[in-house]
């Protein structure tokens, strides 16, 4: 089926499908979690983050309204580096769809490009070979492919190939991944998210997308690859801020010495 526009309902079902694929693979994502620290919780953190969005997002005809609800839920439910990066990306999309009820392939590609930029800007020290790289290179593929077709189904399927290639290359970009011969866990999660969307477009059934209750998810898998190492900042800390009276750069400067992976 050809899909020439993306509205709120289509986005909602696409997101639910992508989230289900990530959640279904949380144990494997935990197992290969080595960067930024080998704490074996990327899958669990993303499963919790996406489960909150899945349960709290509003399915509306308007793309902007649906994204507004997703962005709010993502920020409040985000856990861990990858969870917060996902939340940043969703909010980047929310900001850049220009209050539209629906958008074309061309406008979607532009919104994704801006959303990726927004995500990078929120990170104090962005590192390549991670979920960020796959997001960026997937976005670049959308820019290339949008001129060939106005069909979202074709765009998503072809761009998934670029994202998959980018994922495979993460093990060549970070020494810790190359040593263990695994890809980046967060990057793998993003590709799984895209695979879930493409799978739904091709073979999906709305009856299969029933929202499930958020279950208790263990933080570690039994067979994780993690190595023995000293972790200076062992725990993630998230804070939801409203009505800031200072600019983002100043806030970053004030809290930059409180950890080694800052995302605002």
Please annotate each region the language model reported.
Residues 1-264:
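N-terminal loops that bind phosphate or other acidic moieties
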């Amino acid at each position: 089926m050809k899909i020439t526009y993306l509205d709120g309902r289509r986005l909602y079902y696409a997101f639910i499908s992508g989230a289900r694929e990530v959640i279904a693979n949380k144990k494997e994502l935990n197992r290969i979690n080595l960067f930024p620290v080998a704490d074996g919780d990327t899958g669990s953190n993303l499963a919790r983050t996406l489960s909150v969005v899945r349960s709290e997002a509003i399915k509306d005809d308007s793309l902007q309204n649906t994204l507004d609800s997703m962005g709010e839920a993502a920020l409040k439910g985000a856990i861990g580096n990858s969870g917060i990066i996902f939340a940043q990306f969703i909010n980047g999309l929310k900001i850049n769809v220009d209050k539209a009820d629906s958008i074309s392939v061309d406008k979607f590609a532009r919104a994704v490009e801006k959303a990726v930029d927004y995500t990078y800007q929120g990170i104090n020290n962005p590192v390549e070979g991670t979920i960020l790289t796959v997001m960026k290179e997937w976005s670049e593929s959308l820019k290339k492919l949008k001129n060939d077709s106005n069909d979202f189904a074709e765009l998503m399927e072809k761009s998934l190939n670029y994202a998959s290639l980018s994922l495979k290359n993460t093990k060549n970009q970070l020494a810790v991944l190359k040593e263990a011969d695994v890809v980046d866990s967060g990057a793998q999660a993003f590709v799984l998210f895209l695979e879930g969307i493409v799978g739904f477009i091709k073979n999906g059934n709305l009856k299969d997308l029933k929202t499930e209750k958020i279950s208790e998810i263990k933080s570690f898998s039994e067979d994780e690859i993690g190595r023995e190492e000293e972790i200076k900042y062992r725990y993630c800390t998230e804070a939801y801020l409203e009505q800031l009276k200072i600019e983002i750069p100043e806030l970053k400067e004030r809290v930059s010495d409180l950890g080694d992976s800052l995302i605002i």
